[in-house]
Amino acid sequence: MLDAQQIQDIIPHRYPFLLVDRILEVEGEKRAVGIKNVTVNEEFFNGHFPGYPVMPGVLIVEALAQVFGVIMLGKEENKGKIGLFAGIDGCRFKRQVKPGDQLRLEVEVTRLRGPVAKGKAVATVDGEVACEAELTFSIGPKVS
């Protein structure tokens, strides 16, 4: 299990754009599961939507991409590099995510070719699918 600080040791995201609170499982270069506890204090709820707070779908996808980043950037040869979101296919939103929900973020690598990987990504709340997509991730340059 990785806490927020350990996640930040792997991926370059920081507040307010770090959207993963914990990593529960990492299976080498194959799979990872993360958690995002969605609170009423999230800044995006101020405008999305007043009186009816719903987590923006693009941020759910970003949270999934960050879990993908933990898989790819956790590899020794990629330490210190940046991960780039390179594509999305078949994205579907099936459930609204609201304050008080806990997002379970699961990514499984389905194809790896050099610095580019594809993965099946699923975000769930209480076992219900909130979002699913196929993501493409690319390894970028080292950052300082």
UniProtKB/Swiss-Prot annotation:
Q: Does the keyword Lyase apply?
A: yes
The EC number(s) attached to this protein equal 4.2.1.59
* A single MF term (Gene Ontology): (3R)-hydroxyacyl-[acyl-carrier-protein] dehydratase activity
Q: Where in the cell is it found?
A: Cytoplasm
Coiled coil, from the record: none
**GO (cellular component) term, any one:** membrane
Active site, UniProt feature: H48
GO BP: any one term: fatty acid biosynthetic process
Which reaction equations make up its catalytic activity?
Answer: a (3R)-hydroxyacyl-[ACP] = a (2E)-enoyl-[ACP] + H2O
Instruction: List the InterPro entries.
Output: FabA_FabZ, FabZ, HotDog_dom_sf
Q: What class of enzyme is it?
A: lyase
Keywords in UniProt for this one?
Cytoplasm, Lipid A biosynthesis, Lipid biosynthesis, Lipid metabolism, Lyase
**SUPFAM superfamilies in the cross-refs:** Thioesterase/thiol ester dehydrase-isomerase (SSF54637)
User: Main subcellular localization, coarse class?
Assistant: cytoplasm
Q: Which family does it belong to?
A: Belongs to the thioester dehydratase family. FabZ subfamily.
Q: Which PANTHER family match?
A: 3-HYDROXYACYL-[ACYL-CARRIER-PROTEIN] DEHYDRATASE
UniProt cross-references to HAMAP family, sorted A to Z: FabZ (MF_00406)
Q: What is this protein's function per UniProt?
A: Involved in unsaturated fatty acids biosynthesis. Catalyzes the dehydration of short chain beta-hydroxyacyl-ACPs and long chain saturated and unsaturated beta-hydroxyacyl-ACPs.
Its recorded name reads 3-hydroxyacyl-[acyl-carrier-protein] dehydratase FabZ
Q: Which organism is it from?
A: Bacillus pumilus (strain SAFR-032)
Gene (name only): fabZ
